[in-house]
Amino acid sequence: MSKLVADGYNEIKKAAGPWPEIGWYRGVIRPCHVWQGRIFISGMGREIMINILGQIEDNKLPDIETERLYLRERLVSDAKEIFAYASLAEVTWPAGFPPAESVEEEENYLENIMPKRWIEQKIPSGYGICLKGTDEVIGSIDFNNRHADDVLEMGYLLHPDYWGQGIVTEAARALLEVGFTLLNLHKIEIECYGYNKASQRIAEKLGFTLESRVRDRKDAQGKRCNLLRYGLLRSEWEGR
């Protein structure tokens, strides 16, 4: 959040008095700057709304509403929709794991494997990505690895039908907001293979810095490629 927007946000918050944890608000921060929901971000001439609906409960992150998306907890009942993209080789291999083989396998992952990983790695629950106005999960975004107490790695998947629309970037901005505010992280990282150009573009759009390029690593299929790691510090995010 830029200093200009943050100052305006604080002014409105002070004037409004005590705030409920869940709500919808609208106010003028500065000329041409309109704040909606709990958070306002202005970027590249566009208004970007991020509305965080509540707070963290145990390990569950609050639902989030953005301009076009609704991010919510993934449920076992979402298995069929998630399988629709998690079963595609062009989606999963670049992300570092093999395609799901059945809806039943996906159900087991959602019900047993995923919650166990959250506990063992001390990472918060992630999100299913839904288009606003629908409840269909078309993608996933979460913190999939913990590298330090205050450093988490972000990962994401999206059904190919929705590629090229900026959906992952929009969802990732919301996850950054949660990570740096509610989770009080110092740094968020993104790791991808050198041939995954789409993931590299997302990291660059979000303001991440390429910090390392490890040569000739094996990918999930055993093929040699570069492994790239990007990082974004909280101080850099606050200064945007």
Segments from the language model and where they lie:
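N-terminal, intrinsically disordered charge-dense segments
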Residues: 19-20
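Short loop/turn motifs at secondary-structure junctions and domain boundaries
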Residues: 117-122, 208
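Hydrophobic residues in alpha-helical segments
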Residues: 86, 95, 117-119
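Conserved GNAT-fold acetyl-CoA-binding loop/helix
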Residues: 90-114, 127
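Acyl-donor (CoA/ACP) binding surface of acyl/acetyltransferases
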Residues: 3-4, 13-15, 24-25, 33-92, ...
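Short, well-ordered strand-loop elements centered on a beta-strand within folded domains, enriched
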Residues: 115-116, 154
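Catalytic Tyr-X3-Lys helix of short-chain dehydrogenase/reductase
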Residues: 114-115, 180
